[in-house]
Amino acid sequence: LGDVYKRQVKDIEDQNRTPWNFNLNIKRLINLSLVVVSIQIFLGAWTSTNYASISCADLPLCRGQLLPPADFISGFNFLQTIGPNYLGGLLSDEARVAIHLTHRLGSIVVTLVLLSLIFSLYKNQSLKVAGGLSGTLALQIGLGISNVIFSLPLLIAVGHNLGGLLLITYLAVLRFRE
């Protein structure tokens, strides 16, 4: 993942040594992308912290249903104590399902927003930037799906965490490069 990211950043830097000439629409999409990816990273951390990663072991359904029983109030109780949730926690299955489903929904929102940004970048002739972002998004989607299909193997789970880092870093470079 690190080598892929280095190549993408180098390609971006080689493409333009001067500031990118993004129109206002692209700048707004970059800002929106930063917000939705940040929220999704938080949701991923919440999913992991509350042992909800394997609450839905099938795709595209969860427990064989489109909307299985889910307890969003318990799942998103941010005032819960830390100690009792160690090593499996005390949350109900329905609370964990709610957390997992929210992370899945977040992934759909992130994908739609990033695809809008990628399409706008292509229209703006920023082909390498769009291609790099497309590849990073595809990698992250693949790792997320693999986590569900293969029941959360450590290497894929860590790769998924790094993929989130790559996405947010890529977007930050786009946003803050002058």
Kindly label every feature range from the protein language model.
Residues 1-5:
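Short, small-residue-biased leader/transition segments that mark boundaries at the very start
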Residues 8, 169-178:
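A juxtamembrane structural motif centered on a specific transmembrane helix
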Residues 37-42, 136-146:
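Aromatic-anchored segments of alpha-helical transmembrane domains
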Residues 47-58, 96, 141-165:
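Interfacial helix-loop-helix junctions of multi-pass membrane proteins
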Residues 118-133:
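Membrane-interface helix-loop-helix junctions at transmembrane boundaries of multi-pass membrane enzymes
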Residues 27-47:
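Alpha-helical transmembrane segments of multi-pass integral membrane proteins
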Residues 10-26:
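Membrane-interfacial, low-structure loops and terminal tails that flank and connect transmembrane helices
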Residues 42, 48-104, 108-109, 115:
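Membrane-interfacial catalytic/cofactor-binding modules of polytopic membrane enzymes
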